[in-house]
């Protein structure tokens, strides 16, 4: 079986995604770091099970310029993992690391697994950080995504940020409409109303019979219990 993760604590007051109240325990962080390695080293981590195998892990058809091939594969991977394009210095560092791993292991796939593990262990992946630039479109994309989807921005949202469509009212409205139609909006609908209206407290309350003579729960369809 799979051992349970250490508890990921919610914010004690207000909504559970308030950044100034969230913490990541050293125990949970260590578990995430080990997980990034164990997934990539799993015997089930194969071409048939991994959607980006051909684009990222597969041996290149033309290995003449290995460094250029690694760079080409890392750019979109890092963009999704870090929720914005990597700075040149950061990208260069991962390219050098991957190149060294491929050479030392004599295996392109093995080297790319190691660099993927390193990326998934980075604070830039594990933590959300706000840019000091007020008009950073990628920071806005992350805020929208985590607010409405409870998850990282997808490729389409990052592309909208890249193209500057989040910087004007018409473009932002178009993006928001697309996000609201996406199935991932169900996460928001499940969590926000319950937290906003404090339904957990309502379900735990016991109505006073004298004040609430007509209160009852249909035992055959207890809707309040399935919230």
Indicate residue ranges for each PLM-predicted region:
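Low-complexity, glycine/serine/threonine/alanine-rich intrinsically disordered linker
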Residues: 1-227
